[in-house]
């Protein structure tokens, strides 16, 4: 759904959404100038999350005069409300903050102190692999679903993938897997902050986040069909990146790694 309503034709879809909103708030309720100021965001659909009003109660409340939408930048708070950069003031008895979120900066370790070969883990030194592993971090897998569609769609195929890896390791008497990029992956450029239309809470932590690329399997995809193809129908193990080993081999000074097609 996200691919249909946002990514492929962002300009056209933004125009469509604005037209739909305008049809719900006719000119007798709001002038063109006011509507364009408050209902024409600087970002495209899905660059920031959409809000839905299934019963149309949001627009009915505006037409009834019970609600008002103001799009601006907060300059500061005072004892009576909110001061905006435009110079406008909004009086408020109660302010419910919906911004100011802070994402974890050491994904996916959060507050855990992790070291690999006596070196501290730093997120922005590692590529994400298939959306569920990190380069040079052995025996680590994590499950993260989709944000714009059902979380479990991605979670399920990721869990199935890990199950196949563990079964393979049991069969081959292996006890370690690790992803190696061999210095061959080009990082996706991080957006210029002045041009980035992402939510502020993602901008604040972008430089501390893991690296990703346009090259599969180091790309981050949000399409179930593409992910399912990558996980289930491609050469999952013998792809040149995921390596396996046995501690018994290493203890015997046998530096063999094993890869196989699943």
Briefly describe each language-model feature range.
Residues 1-262:
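N-terminal FAD-binding dinucleotide-binding subdomain shared by FAD-dependent oxidases/monooxygenases
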